[in-house]
A protein has these predicted regions:
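NUDIX/MutT-family hydrolases
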Residues: 100-140
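A generic structural signal for short beta-strands and their flanking turns/coil linkers
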Residues: 30, 63, 68-69, 82-86
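Short, charged/polar surface micro-motifs in flexible loops or helix N-caps
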Residues: 18-21, 29-31, 40-41, 73-74, ...
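Short hydrophobic/aromatic beta-strand or adjacent loop that forms the aromatic wall/cage
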Residues: 7-11, 83-87, 113
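The catalytic Nudix box helix
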Residues: 34-68
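N-terminal strand-loop-strand
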Residues: 1-34, 46
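Active-site-adjacent beta-strand/loop module that shapes the phosphate/pyrophosphate-binding cleft
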Residues: 73-104, 117, 138
Length: 152
């Protein structure tokens, strides 16, 4: 029997007032991606969410953050790896339709340029790595909630 490695991830469905979903394309990533990343030692999924969104998008303020679900996704190629994925939803007030963000932190992604844009949730089928699995859990209208910033 082969040992399986478990990796904990925080995944962010970030939307804006129009209901559009933030996605990006970048080097080393196949297909459309959402902000996501591996939890660091001692970090909670929520803390990782704020860090990853800031690192990969440059956005520093997230509104109405809510946990949607947690699953286990298995990469079947050798060596097998299981990802414990924590999916969150957050809204932002972002007027730009498209922008390029260069990662300043983020370890292996440092210096990578991500091309960010907004898409309708109906385009989620184009997402890589089954990242579209829980788009159906997004509210039909963005919630008006408390504001939480990356520094929280």
């Amino acid at each position: 029997m082969t040992d399986v490695t478990y990796v904990r991830k925080a995944c962010a469905y970030v939307t804006r007032a129009t209901g559009e979903l933030l996605v990006f394309e970048g080097p080393g990533h196949d297909g459309l991606q959402i902000p996501k990343g591996t939890l660091e030692a001692g970090e909670s999924p929520r803390e990782a969410l704020f860090r990853e969104v800031a690192e990969e998008t440059g956005l520093g303020t997230l509104n109405g953050v809510s946990h949607l679900t947690t699953d286990v996704w298995t990469r079947r190629r050798s060596p097998p790896k299981r990802y414990v994925r924590h999916f969150f939803h957050a809204t932002v007030h972002e007027p730009r339709d498209r922008w390029v963000h260069t990662v300043r932190d983020g370890g292996d992604e440092h210096g990578s340029a991500f091309a960010l844009r907004w898409v309708r949730p109906s385009r989620a089928g184009e997402f890589a790595l089954d990242l579209d699995d829980y788009v159906h859990l997004l509210p039909s209208t963005p919630p008006a909630s408390d504001v939480a910033s990356v520094s929280d």
